[in-house]
């Protein structure tokens, strides 16, 4: 979760402490034998299910910061699957997918809403592969629409292509002549905070 104060001026508010959202979707899909990548198939199933059918944990919903954790939710879903299989009960895939997806969305939207209120921004942008999730896109638009905050999401055609999203940032730097020196070394594990003006996590008040 990043506060973009200007192009190249980023404040990292918080991030996942374990699994990323897309990774959690992939692992749940794998546990169900639905293949890879898991996001599209889980999303498609969820659209046909009841998000209240199964209660899964909303990890770190009230943690008092902007950190996320998906590992516990993933484990809870896998434990449920294993329990149903041992009992010989058929799993309602749409209901399970919808319940899992809703647990993810509730936390993502709640923390984003608090961040918007704390920073006072008037625009919210959804990025990353998870931006392709229709339910998450709709939840952000509904929540922030009521607050008068403009929501921007990438076209679905590029949401699953990380290279395209990175290229957009590079194009902006190119057009503004924001070139790095030739002494810059490649670092596949570089963090956004290393290139921003402030990498210190921000603790929200009143969460």
Residue positions per predicted region:
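A cross-family phosphate/adenosyl-ligand binding-site feature
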Residues: 36, 176-192
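Short glycine-rich phosphate-binding loop at a beta-alpha junction
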Residues: 119-130, 152-155
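A contiguous, well-structured pocket-lining segment that forms one wall/lid of small-molecule binding clefts
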Residues: 44-124, 134-147, 174-177, 194-207
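Conserved phosphate-binding/catalytic loops in two-lobed NTP-binding clefts
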Residues: 141-165, 180
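Buried hydrophobic packing segments
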Residues: 28, 112, 166-170
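Glycine-rich phosphate-binding loop plus the immediately following alpha-helix
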Residues: 2-50, 74-84
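A short glycine/serine-rich beta->alpha loop
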Residues: 11-16, 62-66, 150-159
């Amino acid at each position: 979760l990043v506060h973009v104060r200007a192009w190249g001026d980023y404040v990292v508010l918080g991030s996942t402490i374990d699994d990323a959202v897309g990774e959690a979707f992939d692992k749940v899909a794998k546990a169900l034998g639905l293949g890879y990548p898991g996001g599209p198939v889980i999303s498609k199933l969820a659209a046909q299910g009841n998000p209240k059918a199964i209660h899964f944990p909303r990890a770190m919903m009230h943690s008092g910061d902007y950190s996320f954790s998906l590992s516990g939710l993933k484990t809870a879903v896998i434990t449920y699957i294993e329990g149903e299989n041992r009992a010989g009960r058929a799993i309602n895939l749409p209901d399970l997918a919808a319940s899992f997806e809703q647990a993810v969305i509730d936390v993502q939207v709640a923390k984003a809403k608090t961040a918007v209120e704390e920073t006072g921004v008037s625009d919210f942008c959804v990025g990353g592969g998870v931006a392709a999730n229709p339910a998450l896109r709709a939840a952000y638009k509904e929540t922030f629409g009521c607050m008068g905050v403009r929501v921007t999401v990438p076209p679905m055609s590029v949401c699953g292509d990380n290279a395209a999203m990175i290229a957009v940032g590079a194009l902006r730097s190119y057009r503004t002549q924001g070139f790095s020196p030739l002494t810059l070394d490649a670092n596949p594990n570089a963090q956004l905070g290393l290139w921003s003006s402030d990498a210190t996590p921000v603790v929200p008040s009143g969460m």
